[in-house]
Amino acid sequence: MSNKVLITNSQKAVKVPSGLRILIRRACNAVLEYEHFEAPAEISVNFVDNAAIAELNNQYRNKPMPTDVLSFPLGVDGKYDVDENNGCKMLGDIVISMERAQEQANLYGHPLQREVAFLTVHSMLHLLGYDHENGGLEAMRMREKEEAVLLQLGLPRTVSYTE
């Protein structure tokens, strides 16, 4: 049985590039493979605008400003509920601000696709229990995993991108 990646576009501010949904599915699957996550998983990814993510950021993190991505893990200590309809472990929800992703892609000089792939990989690691809020070794391990998965996807940080 394969993983289920449900992708919704709830914004109109940024055009979703062709192939982005496939890249997101590849990124989710690459993280699960890298982390040796054996069971089929279900992940929800929602594209929103800055206003929507600012509202969620305020509601759940008490930070009334836009951010690039929010993760809403459903698992606790590596244990996940199983969707009885499809047998998948429900990992959680990823919410990506496409406006912020475009701003960051422009800032870092790479395509929107690479930025959204990075945000997806980053958020997937959160869904699997990783955290970087306190810095230190956990944050370094998370960054190393992000870069390893992006390299596996052919999207390393060191490449000079052109669209």
What does each model-found stretch correspond to?
Residues 1-117, 125-163:
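An acidic/histidine-cluster motif and surrounding catalytic segment
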